[in-house]
Amino acid sequence: KDLSPKTSDTIVSYGERLSSIIVTELIEGAQWFDSRTFIKTEKKHNKHILDAELTNELVKKAFSSVPKVALVPGFISSDKTTGDVTNLGRGGSDYTAAIIAAALDANSLEIWTDVDGFMTADPRVISTAYTITELSYVEATELCNFGAKVVYPPTIYPVCHKNIPIIIKNTFNPDGVGTVIKQEVSNPQSKAIKGISSINDTSLITVQGLGMVGVIGVNYRIFKALAKNGISVFLVSQASSENSTSIG
């Protein structure tokens, strides 16, 4: 009857916590690390946001002596003030790996998933879609934000900041070519369009009227109202005459 965000975060954390402990026991020489002790968040606008500075410091301390194999439960974190269990959102395990890789200045970040990497389109819709071998950080971020669910979007920033390449490989097809995400691709002008992605079940709202023309702060009021209600905008289009603004 009582499912508060705090209770929910605690319940959903058990999957990663238990599975990582089990895998640790199966791998010789492996050591388990509790990510709640070094992945720290703070509450802003009713959301748990990573405290990057504190987290980086704690990660470096936790991994000052790295064992042969380190197992870390992804996705879960803890509030830096209360110590309560929090999480990094759906897909947060990728984000956990990126945070640790960036803090430790890793040579690369490998993400093993169930697809061969980024595709030129959704293969369930376009049968001729094929794997994109190279993407820049910006290109990958755009594809992720618009529906390509290969990598959790926040994953890219920590490693991009440190110029650490991300290698996407398929667990069920380890010999597949995969996708490498890095600062600069080998031939950036090879294709004007790298890939096509789409988002289902989204809303597009247009605010229009001649009374908007030349009026300062209209968009500010729109975005303020959305932010107040915890709504994030991923698409904005405005007419040059300023008489309409479309948001998605």
Identify the function of each model-found stretch.
Residues 30, 70, 86, 166, ...:
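A broad, low-specificity signal marking well-ordered, structured residues that form hydrophobic/aromatic
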Residues 33, 72-74, 112, 153, ...:
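Generic beta-strand/beta-sheet core signal
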Residues 76-77, 93, 105, 116-117, ...:
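Short, glycine-/Ser/Thr-/acidic-enriched flexible segments
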Residues 162-177, 200:
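Active-site C-terminal subdomain of aminotransferase-like
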Residues 177-248:
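A conserved regulatory-domain signal marking ACT and ACT-like small-molecule sensing domains
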